[in-house]
Each structure stands twice: as structure tokens, then as C-alpha cells.
Amino acid sequence: MWAHLFKHGFKYEQQNSLSKSLILSVLNSTATKREAKDYLIKYANGSSNYHYLLLIRNIATQSERSLHRLSDSIRRLKFLGISPVCVLLPSGRIQTEVEKMDKLITLSQLKPLVLDYGLSRAFDGSYESIMQTALDTEYCTTRGIVPIVKPYIYDQSTASRGLISDPVLFMDQLSRDSSLKFDKFFILNRSGGIPSGERNQNSHIFINLSQEYQKIHRTLTSSIRTIVERQPRSEDLLDRLELYVRESDIISLEAEYKEHMENLQLMNTVLSNLSSSATGVITTINAASSPSDTVNPLVHNLLTDRSIISSSLPRFKNKSGNFLSPSGQDWYEMPVEIETDEETLQGEDSVFVTTVLKKGVDIKEFDYSHLTSENTVNLPKQFQIKLHDESTYNNSCSKYKLDLVKFKNIIDKSFGRELDLNHYLNRINGKIASIIIIGDYEGIAILTYEGPPDNKFVYLDKFAVLPHLKGSLGISDIIFNLMFKKFPREVVWRSRANNVVNKWYFQRSVAVLDLSMELDEGDMQESEFKLFYHGDPESSLKSIVAIDRLRDLAKYVRNIKPSWVK
């Protein structure tokens, strides 16, 4: 399928035919055409030496068999164009961890190079990476030499080496090393990615750090506080005794959540130092050892720069309302896995234990109903009126104004046709529910209120992403996630019946209706559109299954006139 991409001027410095066969096979099984092209341009031409930071927690407890399985993944990643730099964090078994990491890299058919410290602190308090000062990184990369960085800092003022006390500061300084092109940051552990209450404590699929970091940090802080306080269900003696009996489990649970917090902080700090295209992945050692490229989160992310499944797919529901009790158990009744070998994790699904993270893109939400000269720039004269109703403003974006030139530009480019701006503004002005802007108008969603005054519904009128960014940075997922959170009860949109994106839309909806069907007796019109409906599954069972509701929505959506220049 992708063989033609290796022709027509594309140069790839292959080690042998096996390398080419591996890459083609993997691309066929995992990547879209756009993803394959992006991967080949970036990694497979041999012109750049990309690296990933690899942090493996508790590697000292891993068995020989576990190391063998993981080494296959590291070897595949090297074949596919990216080399590891291994980092250890403080523990009581540093020497054992060094030996295990050395063994892992050797099994990967690479050459380990143990560095006694990672940073050097100068007399003025500044830090410098040893890899930047003491290594020829290009030489190391081309010869398969892999640094293993011990968690120590050399202090020039005392001529001594000390164990790091702040892992986040340590990784912050290491990731600033400009001599290495760090494009990925992988954390492997026992418990997997950052837990999500919306997914029954399975891992977040994707985190846009610029948007979600503070909220997730608060959630983890609250969870840790709940565990630390150790509050019984009641003052009853049996409930208090149960806490005492389960103390060891509670201690393990507390350590696990503190590790999740540190992982989040590490990712936020490191990715902030790297390019906007850099990606982080947190997953289990077992998932990272999968021989299947379609479910191995590390290999899959290298090839596609995304998670194994989309983060905007329907979520699991946690009906208990308890942050660690999807089955109605109390927080201290949750099972805690402390085994580390892979036999205890057989059947583990990579989807549930993996979080992909990016530094992310800025998001602006404009929730005013009217576009006016006070909240919009480049507004046509006939719309330049002043409204003093406070509801027309979004306080969170009071310092920003909507730029209609950029607004129109992204819609024109995304749809491949020209928007009739005056016609469009006449249609939506006064009915705007929200306008979501991603980055510098790299993605946009325009939502309006449609229907009768006493029963309005939210309609996704326009959804656009700049063509060269479609499928990248998770922009579509970010928009749909935010849209569904803002309007959880119901959102409706329409799409041409032959739109190639309809499969993606179908996966995110709970109902689809052909708008050319007979909506009422004798009410049938030609239409090239399908209607998609998304709603909260619990409330939708009552409202959406009622076909009358769908038909009412469909009549309004069917009759919306397009606003394209003819």
C-alpha cells in the first residue's frame, strides 16, 4: 500500500531489505496515508537523529523474560528511526536498576553506556547536561550506543556527586539538552497512564496539557487527600477495623496515586521544553512489550503520533460517583496489583492502560450570541452594532476578539470552497451557542441554537481543521471532547452522505438519520445530508429513542440553507 512512497524522489538509507519490509508491513497495519507520509518524511530518511527519553519505573523487579519481551519493542523503535536515552530515578536499588537497564539495552542489540550522573551544577547554580558536554551524540547514535543516566548531579563547587532530590527538576534540565532531538518521552510502569474518572479509572486516552493539566492535577490531589485521610464509611467498629486490615493495600494505593501525580508533572515539564510536535506516552511495561504493532502504544505512536483509539469516542460511565469505586466499592476496597511480572497482566488491553500527552494547543471559547464590533474584528459594516447585554460576552475571552478574516480562511481551506460571509452571519448572528478556536485558527467549531424558542437544541454548524493538520495534534478529538462536555445533553450535526469522515462521525453519535427519508406523512424532501445525534447515554435512552424527537430535529436541520458562494 505504501510502496509508492519509497519511490519518486524519496530517499531512505536502509540497513537491509528487512528494514524496508518491516517498515512497509508496520505502516500497512497501523497508519493512514497521511500518517505514513508524515512518518517517512520525519524518521525514515536517515537525515535526523531523533531520540526518546525512556523512564522505566521499578525495572529492578522485572524478570528476565519481561526484559526480553520489552527489548523487542526497543529494537523495533530503533529500526523505525528513533533511539532511546534511558533515565533512572532515585530508589533504594539504583545499582540493580542500572544492571537491569544495561541488560535490557544489550538484549535490544544496542550498546549501553552508563553515565554516573546526568547533570553538572556550575558555581553560579546553572545546570548542564553531561550528554551535551561529554558525548558525541551523533557518533553514539550511528553506532547504537545508548546512554543510561544515573539520578545524580555533580556539584562543581564541592567536587562531589549527590543523589537528586527533585525528579521533576532533574528531568526539566535533562530535556533542555539541545544536542539531542528529543521527540518522545515514554514512561513505563506497573499501573499505566493517568486515571480518568470519566473512564471508570481506566487511563485517560489523550491529554492536551495546556488545556487539562490544572484540572487533572486538582483531581489527583483530591484523590490522594482522600486516601491519606483514610476515612471509614462510618464510626462503626467493623468499618474502622476494615481500614486497619486493609492498611497495606491502602499504602500501595497511596503510592500508586502519588506516582501518577509525579508522572503528570514530569510529562508537563519535559514536553514544555520540547517542540510542539513532541509526544509523551505513559503505559505499562506489559503493554509496551506487545509484539503487535497495532496495539503496542510506543510503536503505534511513533508511526501515527496518536493514541491507539480516539479520545473522543464514547466514555465509560462511573455511576458510583466515587473516585475509585466503579463497582460501588469504597475507595479502600479497590484491588491493588503489586505483582510486576507479565504473567499477572495477561489479557491487559493497551487501550485501558495508556495515556498519550502533548504540550497541546491554546483553546479559546467565545460564548456570546451576537458578533459585534465589540467582540469581533474585520466585521462587515452592516453587522457593526453595539449590544450592551452582558450575555453577549464571554468573560474568559474578554481580551480576545474573533478575527473574521482567519475565521473565513480556515472554513474556505477546510471545505475547499468559499464561504458567503454575509449570508452566513445573517444566519447565525443572535443564535450562536459557542465558537471554539484551536490555536491560531488551526481548528474551529461553530455551534448554534436551532429550533423553536421553547425547545432549542445545539447544532454543530461548522467544524473545520486546516488541511495540513487534519489527523495531527488531536485537534478533532480536542474539539469534539470539549463540545460534548459543554453540551452533554445533546448535539446535532449534519454531513453529506458521501463524506469520507462519516465513519468517524458515526462512532461519536448515538443516532443517525437520513434526511431524505419521510419525516412525517407526506413530508419528504431530497437531501444529500445525514443527521448525526450525540447525547448523554443515560438521558438519551429517554429522549432520543423517541423517534418523534429525532424527526423534529431533522426538520430544522434539513432546512438549513448552505452559505457558500455560488
UniProtKB/Swiss-Prot annotation:
List the molecular function annotations (GO) for this entry: L-glutamate N-acetyltransferase activity
Q: Where is the N-acetyltransferase domain?
A: 391-557
The subcellular location is: Mitochondrion
Q: What reactions does this protein catalyze? A: L-glutamate + acetyl-CoA = N-acetyl-L-glutamate + CoA + H(+)
Task: List the EC numbers from the record.
Answer: 2.3.1.1
Q: What does this protein do?
A: N-acetylglutamate synthase involved in arginine biosynthesis.
The family note in this entry says:
Belongs to the acetyltransferase family.
Q: What is this protein called?
A: Amino-acid acetyltransferase, mitochondrial
